[in-house]
Structure formats: C-alpha cells, structure tokens
C-alpha cells in the first residue's frame, strides 16, 4: 500500500473519531414551516413532453448486469413503436455501436400505455463515459452516462439515496437538492415508492408518465437502482386489476436474472466496492419462500475482500420510532435480522415512513421462548438502519413520533430531503443527510461509517445503551 493511501486511511480514522463523538440521541429541533404537500399540476414545466412526433420520453437507465459492465436503457414512445435500438459510443471513440431491445405495452383499467422500450447495452468498459441516442430521425434524443470503476476493495464511489419521491413541489425540491449537492452522487439507491399514481382515482397511470418525465433529468444520466414499495403494488380488484406490480414491472427493468435471482423484486449488484442487495417488503419472505431461499444462498456468496461494503435496500423499515407504519417491518426483521448480523451487513436503507431517521448499530436477535429477551441492544456486528422515506410525496410528512425517543435511535427529523453515501476505501465511508430547507452543501445529519468486515470499531454517535 502506498504512503498516500496509508495517509488517507489514518486521516479517515482520525476524522471518524472526531465526527462520531458520542452524544445523546437527537430528535431534531428544526421546525419546518407547515405547508400542504401537493402534486405539481399536469402542465408543469417538469412534465413537459419533448417536442416532435413520437419523440422518446421518460428515459431512464439502471445497471444491466451483476458487475457494472452493462446498462439497461428504457424509454417510452407515444405515437407508434418506432425503433427499439440504442446507438452508443465511448467519449474517446467515434465508432458507434448499436444495441437492440424490445417493446411492450400494457393496459390498466381505462388506460393504455405508450410503447415501452427496454434495451441492454453489454460489454461496456469500466470507468468510461458513453454517449447514447434513442429515437429516429428529427426526434432522436441524446444523453450520456459514466460506467463505474472496476469492482475492487478500495474503489471510492458515491451513492445518492432517495425514497418515496412522488411528484409534488417538495419532490422537485428534493431532486434539485440532490442534483446540486456538492457531494456528487454517481448512482441513486432508490428505496421504493416512485410515482404515487395509486393515490389518484382508478390508479391514474398518466401519473406514471408524468413521473417518468419529471425524473428524466437525472435517471437518463445516472443509474437509479430500483426497490419496489407499497405504492408500486397497484392491486385494485375493484376495477378489475388483480396483477400486483403491473405498471412498475412493465416500466422498470432490473438485472435480476444476471445474478440468478428468481424475481425482479429481489436481486444483487456489485458496484465499485459495494455489494447491494435489494429485497422486497411486499413479496412473500417467510421460510421456504423464493425470496427467503434466495437470500439464504446469496449472503454467503458475498466476498468482502472484493466488495467490502454490504448494503441492503428495502422499503418497510425494521427500526422505526415514528407512529406511522410502526412495527410494520417486524415479521421480516424476525426472519432475516440474524442473517444480517451473522454476515455483518454495514448499512440498511428503507423508506415508507415519510421522515428521516438513523439508528445506532443494534440487533434484537437474542429472544427465545425461555429468556424473554426482546429489546434492541447495541451490537457492533449489526447494520446501521436508515429511513430515507422523505422524498416529498403528496401524502406529506410523518410528524408523530414515539416518546421518549428509543435509545437505538441516533437522529430523527420530520423533514423532506435526501442523503449521500461517499465510500472512501474498504474501511471508511462518509454518510450525510440533507434537508430541503438548507443550502445545498449543508449536512443536517452525518457520520463516518466504519466497515464491519475490515474495520469493525465502534462508530456510534450516541451514548451507550
């Protein structure tokens, strides 16, 4: 290891010790101005349809394989199918290549979708900027993305974290804050609840279209890693819609087959020095179910010498001290938490509760029918649990908290915002949460995270339990 890298390690250790000085758990005293959260009207600029006949819209990308050398490009054409091909080339090459995808449509009650295109670009080079074009003729649209560095233990990488976004004025503020944050995210880990179309009469799927156009300014340029939330279920037998997750699965593809997963709702990816596992809070997760069996086999596969950072995404939080959705994730926690502790998961991100909360490293796995132990305890092999369901959707904030604040809860606040996770190396990452009311560089909550496999020191930010 070179002297400069050793110096960075030592600096990170010192900074972590200073930044994570132990204090009591915080219920933020920040007073957010009380305002009704409302969706932006259909004629808002952020929903503008691109000009021209059959112009591609709702462009979004996500990782297209297990290791970061492929990208799924998706878009919608409204007037006719058009072309499903993607033309792409690297920044330093004039040689253009073509990838071909497929087209699908769906109906939902009285709504018929446009033509939804999905095309996977494969065999990309790591750490390379690519330009790509979709559409044909005068309405061709051009975008770009950058592939991640090659997977490795000390590869730095920065993730954005957003959940429960919706398409309100507050949603727009959240996305703007993420875009202008000086800690530049390179990919977004999205913890579920996208469009909130199901809050409209008959689950108005036009609101899936408007949401796709709204987020295109980010999703077309950097991959968003998708997690399904309860607002993606769209199960409405009263109007004849009995196939759960229909709009979500038609519109948003993920690389679940690349890793041997059996369903689109749970899958892993490697990206830089991180191993990301996406789970489904709204699919069966009990013993012997497909998700249970898959996760039981998946966790032992994670090679922490290759990808030191083990991160899990889900929608319903396991540790939640708000009265909203209180203990909804409890049965899933009972099933899977022992595995998380055994395999030393570093961080778990969830949404669902429309507020922000960060826990200490705690577990509640000691109970058996005799000992009666059913209280969370400090556990340095356990993850930090973070609820980031504060994206800004029209349902508003969860302001009612349990009192007193549980000892496992390090920081909580009912404000809209987003977060970033800046992985430095195999031992340290810097996490920060940013509320919408602050300047773009302001951190309302932060901590240095110590990796559980390579540097399992106490990184608590509050006094001991």
Swiss-Prot record:
E.C. number: 3.1.3.2
Residues holding Fe cation: 164, 193, 196, 354
Annotated binding of substrate, by residue: 230, 352-354
SUPFAM superfamilies per record: Metallo-dependent phosphatases (SSF56300), Purple acid phosphatase, N-terminal domain (SSF49363)
CDD domains noted in UniProt: MPP_PAPs (cd00839)
Tagged with keyword Methyltransferase: no
N-terminal signal peptide: 1-32
Pfam families cross-referenced by the UniProt entry: Metallophos, Metallophos_C, Pur_ac_phosph_N
Glycosylation sites recorded in the entry for this protein: 110, 138, 172, 303, 400, 425
Cofactor: Fe cation; Mn(2+); Zn(2+); Cu(2+)
Compartments in which it is found: Secreted
Record: active site: 325
Domain of life: Eukaryota
Protein name: Purple acid phosphatase 2
Source organism: Ipomoea batatas
Lineage: Eukaryota, Viridiplantae, Streptophyta, Embryophyta, Tracheophyta
Gene encoding the protein: PAP2
């Amino acid at each position: 290891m070179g002297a400069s890298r050793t110096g960075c390690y030592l600096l990170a250790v010192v900074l972590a010790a200073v930044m994570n000085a132990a204090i009591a758990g915080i219920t933020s005293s920040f007073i957010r101005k009380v305002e009704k959260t409302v969706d932006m009207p259909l004629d808002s600029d952020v929903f503008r349809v691109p000009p021209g006949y059959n112009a591609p819209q709702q462009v979004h990308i996500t990782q297209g394989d297990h290791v970061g050398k492929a990208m799924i490009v998706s878009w919608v054409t409204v007037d006719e199918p058009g072309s499903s091909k993607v033309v792409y080339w690297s920044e330093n090459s004039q040689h253009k290549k073509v990838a071909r995808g497929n087209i699908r449509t769906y109906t939902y009650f009285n709504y018929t979708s446009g033509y939804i295109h999905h095309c996977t670009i494969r065999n990309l080079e790591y750490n390379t900027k690519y330009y790509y074009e979709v559409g044909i003729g005068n309405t061709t649209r051009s975008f770009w993305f950058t592939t991640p560095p090659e997977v490795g233990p000390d590869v730095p990488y920065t993730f954005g974290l957003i959940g429960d976004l919706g398409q309100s004025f507050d949603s727009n503020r959240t996305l703007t804050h993420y875009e202008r944050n000086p800690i530049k995210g390179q990919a977004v880990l999205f913890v579920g609840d996208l469009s909130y179309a199901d809050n409209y009469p008959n689950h108005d799927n036009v609101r899936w279209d408007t949401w796709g156009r709204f987020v295109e300014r980010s999703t077309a340029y950097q991959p968003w890693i998708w997690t399904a939330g309860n607002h993606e279920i769209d199960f409405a037998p009263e109007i004849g819609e009995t196939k759960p997750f229909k709009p979500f699965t038609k519109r948003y593809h993920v690389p679940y087959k690349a890793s041997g997963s059996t369903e689109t709702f749970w899958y892993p990816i490697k990206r830089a020095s991180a191993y990301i596992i996406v789970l489904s809070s709204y699919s069966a997760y009990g013993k012997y179910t497909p998700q249970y069996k898959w996760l039981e086999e998946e966790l032992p596969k994670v090679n922490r010498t290759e990808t030191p950072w083990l991160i899990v995404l889900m929608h319903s939080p396991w540790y939640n001290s708000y009265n909203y959705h209180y203990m909804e994730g409890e049965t899933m926690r009972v099933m899977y938490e022992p595995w998380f502790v055994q395999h030393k998961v570093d961080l778990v991100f969830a949404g669902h509760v429309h507020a922000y909360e960060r826990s200490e490293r705690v577990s509640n796995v000691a109970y058996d029918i005799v000992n009666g132990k059913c209280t969370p305890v400090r556990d340095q092999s356990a993850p930090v649990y973070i609820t980031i369901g504060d994206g800004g959707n029209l349902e508003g904030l969860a302001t009612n908290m349990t009192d007193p604040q549980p000892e496992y809860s390090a920081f909580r606040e009912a404000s809209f915002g987003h977060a970033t996770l800046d992985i430095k190396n195999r031992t340290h990452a810097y996490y920060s949460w940013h509320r919408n009311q602050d300047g773009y560089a302001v951190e309302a909550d932060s901590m240095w995270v110590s990796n559980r496999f390579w540097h399992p020191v106490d990184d608590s930010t509050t006094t001991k339990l």
